[in-house]
């Protein structure tokens, strides 16, 4: 019975061994006669020590309490009693080694390699805890979930790259197909167009018969006009004589006006500003309402203006438009035809001009700008009349007793506006007029005694570029010849008649288009300038593009690229030093940190996840604060039992993990006995700062956990060490402490020194 009772008693003790209270180093059977307790074989008390109670107190050195306490504290840190143990090297006894040898396994080859492979070294650093400094090694603990997530992300990126590559290849293929299709369609369109052109049959031209019909029709018209002009005026014959010449379209060419005429016009305008009577007279003459006496008086003003010197200030010569043939015929041929026709068609019944017409002839081509009141301007189309139009206008003026119709005010407004741009247009306009200037014979000058010689500067500039002008004009003639239609002679004659009638109707519309003419002339000048500039630039080489008065093209701004900053060797070394390995990049967030003491490499501990981490200024040092629960053994037993109850009725996927469960929120949990610890980690490279900072729980979660411990538990009170002992009453304790220090010193001495001591 005694044996059974003994067995039951031992079994009961084993079952209750897990729930035994921890003494936390307090020695059993302390001597109540002494004023202190023995904790870890060191004299401690809750109250401050009272050394005056000793009869024969020993010194601090002889008592050996201070040095023993430092040694005990360092051993406590190295054993990691405040950290959670993760891995420890296992030692096998002789029986286990013999069994492994029988199985053919070398016991020395078995090391906890599987556990070691799960830990990847991060760096070496220093830990400062209390008065101690420990060199430690930091490790990253491998996590299967992190590895799986990394591999999935890597595969997803790889799939995205493949999809993107396929899309790019497909886009390239489609682009190539579209390009080939466009090319094919273009070729088909060209082939169809060629076939259509081949199918077209060109109508054969009958130049001799058509021209004969046209000449016959024009000759009949000319005879009719000559008969009508014989009764009214001899000037009418010019229209019929030039009708043969006016076969083809005319184009306007700008030429400079005579210098004396421009000076006279400017002086007249200047006099009209100061003399109101002259201004009114100019308005009457321009409107065709002046009498013969007023015209005679106006002639005196003209003579006076001619005698005056040029006005002071800067002014530039004006240009006038002269119509020339647009086809390959030269002006010389046109003038010869006019002269021959005039000699043939002159009749003895030519009537002399009246005095009013003679006066109008002398005053014609004088263009003045009187100071008109608003709303009384004479409108014009901004285009000076040609030679035939001016002759026709003179004849109609004589019939209507209105001698002067060519004083066009809107034309003068145009000339004032064009003075600004004439300098730049001069070179291009001269380029267009060079052919007509060279081919005009002396007979034309005899036929037109009223025309004055051109300006000397204009003639010189025209003489500089004969070859270029001829090349340009020949190209234009070719274009005009290619643009001729293949219509019949009747349609050609009708178009000529229509063009002549449109030219005459233009003069009649001058009085109703004053404001529009000013704007249109401005636009026309600018467009003409652009056309002439493009023609000159296309014909000339790049070096000869700039001419007198022509504005140079704006210089293209040069694009500058910023130079990439050249990195020094130090910066390159810093960049290399800041680079992380692939494994370290995986665990840049949520890593589990493990460390080992260099003094005790057989054991590795986990850094507590419920810690508050603070990075210091140097970015290589950190303050780590956490709470140590001294009765964590009792709390751990309660946690495992409680999790079993909670997960019993749940699926495996819904099980609560230990790291997600806070036992201190349960009222049945044992009250924690805790103390706070703060340590310092130094010497951690900057590149690992993200890994270190993100390896702990968020600060809000840690604060809630610590608050639950502080609210439920009680802080462990500190003990006060007695650094002095009594020589007689504490003789054995002091001797034991001194012997322990002596033995600890012997471990640092060599074998030779040990033999000498022995």
Curated annotation (Swiss-Prot):
Residues 1-34, 153-253, 323-577 are annotated as: Disordered. GO terms for molecular function: ATP-dependent H2AZ histone chaperone activity. Residues 388-427 have a biased composition (Polar residues). It comes from the Eukaryota. Residues 351-360 have a biased composition (Low complexity). Residues 1-10, 175-185, 199-212, 235-253, 555-565 have a biased composition (Basic residues). InterPro entries: Swc3 (IPR037651). Residues 153-174, 186-198, 213-227, 336-345, 444-487, 526-549 have a biased composition (Basic and acidic residues). Keywords: Activator, Chromatin regulator, Coiled coil, Nucleus, Transcription, Transcription regulation. Residues 151-233 form a coiled coil. This is SWR1-complex protein 3. It is found in: Nucleus. Component of the SWR1 complex which mediates the ATP-dependent exchange of histone H2A for the H2A variant HZT1 leading to transcriptional regulation of selected genes by chromatin remodeling. Involved in chromosome stability. Component of the SWR1 chromatin remodeling complex. Belongs to the SWC3 family. Residues 323-335, 488-509 have a biased composition (Acidic residues). Its main location: nucleus.
């Amino acid at each position: 019975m005694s044996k059974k009772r003994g067995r039951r008693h031992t079994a009961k003790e084993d079952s209750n061994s897990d729930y035994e209270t921890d003494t936390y180093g307090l020695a059993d059977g302390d001597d109540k006669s002494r004023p202190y307790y023995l904790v870890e074989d060191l004299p401690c008390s809750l109250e401050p020590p009272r050394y005056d109670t000793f009869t024969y107190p020993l010194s601090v050195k002889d008592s050996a309490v201070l040095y023993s306490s430092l040694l005990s504290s360092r051993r406590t840190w190295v054993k990691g009693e405040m950290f959670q143990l993760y891995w420890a090297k296992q030692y096998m006894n002789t029986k286990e080694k013999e069994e492994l040898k029988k199985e053919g396994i070398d016991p020395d080859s078995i090391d906890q390699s599987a556990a070691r492979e799960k830990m990847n070294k991060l760096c070496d650093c220093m830990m400062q805890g209390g008065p101690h400094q420990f060199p430690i090694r930091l490790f990253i603990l491998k996590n299967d979930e992190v590895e799986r997530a990394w591999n999935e992300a890597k595969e997803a990126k790889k799939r995205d790259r493949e999809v993107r590559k396929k899309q790019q290849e497909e886009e390239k293929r489609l682009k190539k197909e579209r390009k080939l299709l466009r090319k094919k369609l273009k070729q088909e369109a060209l082939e169809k167009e060629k076939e259509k052109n081949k199918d077209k049959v060109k109508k054969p031209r009958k130049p001799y018969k058509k021209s004969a019909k046209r000449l016959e029709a024009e000759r009949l018209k000319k005879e009719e006009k000559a008969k009508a002009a014989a009764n009214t005026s001899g000037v009418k014959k010019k229209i019929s004589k030039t009708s043969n010449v006016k076969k083809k379209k005319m184009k306007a060419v700008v030429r400079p006006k005579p210098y004396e005429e421009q000076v006279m016009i400017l002086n007249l305008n200047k006099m009209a500003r100061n003399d109101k009577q002259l201004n009114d007279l100019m308005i009457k003459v321009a409107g065709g309402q002046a009498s013969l006496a007023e015209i005679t008086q106006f002639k005196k003003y003209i003579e006076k203006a001619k005698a005056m010197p040029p006005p002071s200030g800067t002014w530039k010569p004006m240009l006038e438009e002269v119509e020339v043939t647009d086809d390959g015929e030269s002006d010389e041929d046109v003038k010869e035809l006019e002269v021959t026709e005039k000699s043939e068609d002159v009749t003895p019944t030519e009537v002399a001009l009246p005095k009013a017409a003679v006066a109008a002839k002398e005053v014609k081509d004088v263009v003045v700008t009187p100071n008109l009141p608003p709303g009384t301007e004479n409108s014009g189309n901004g285009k000076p009349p040609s030679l035939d139009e001016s002759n026709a206008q003179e004849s109609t003026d004589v019939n209507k007793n209105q001698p002067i119709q060519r004083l066009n005010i809107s034309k003068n407004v145009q000339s004032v506006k064009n003075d600004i741009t004439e300098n730049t247009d001069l070179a291009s306009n001269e380029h267009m007029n060079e052919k007509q200037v060279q081919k005009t014979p002396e007979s034309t000058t005899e036929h037109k005694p009223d025309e004055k010689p051109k300006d000397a500067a204009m003639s010189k500039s025209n003489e500089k570029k004969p070859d270029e002008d001829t090349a340009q004009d020949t190209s234009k003639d070719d274009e005009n010849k290619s643009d001729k239609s293949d219509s019949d002679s009747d349609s050609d004659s009708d178009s000529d008649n229509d063009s002549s009638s449109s030219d005459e109707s233009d003069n009649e519309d001058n009085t109703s288009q004053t404001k529009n003419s000013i704007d249109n002339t401005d636009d026309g000048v600018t467009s003409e300038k652009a056309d002439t500039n493009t023609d000159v630039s296309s014909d000339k080489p790049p070096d000869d593009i700039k001419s007198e008065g022509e504005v140079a093209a704006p210089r293209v701004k040069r694009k500058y690229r910023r130079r990439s900053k050249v990195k020094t060797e130090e910066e390159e070394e810093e960049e290399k030093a800041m680079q992380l390995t692939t494994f370290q990049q995986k665990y840049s967030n949520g890593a589990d940190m493990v460390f080992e003491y260099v003094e005790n490499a057989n054991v590795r501990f986990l850094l507590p996840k419920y810690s508050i981490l603070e990075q210091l200024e140097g970015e290589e040092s950190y303050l780590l604060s956490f709470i140590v629960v001294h009765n964590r053994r009792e709390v751990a037993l309660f946690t495992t039992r409680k999790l079993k109850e909670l997960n019993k009725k749940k699926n495996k996927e819904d099980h609560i993990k230990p790291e997600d469960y806070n036992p201190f929120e349960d009222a049945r949990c044992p009250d924690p006995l805790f103390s706070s610890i703060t340590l310092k980690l130094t010497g951690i490279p900057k590149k690992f700062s993200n890994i270190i900072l993100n390896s702990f729980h968020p600060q809000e979660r840690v604060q809630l956990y610590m608050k639950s411990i502080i609210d439920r538990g009680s802080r462990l009170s500190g003990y006060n060490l007695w650094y002095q002992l009594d020589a007689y009453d504490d003789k054995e304790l002091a001797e034991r402490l001194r012997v322990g220090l002596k033995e600890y010193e012997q471990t640092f001495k060599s074998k030779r020194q040990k033999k000498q001591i022995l």
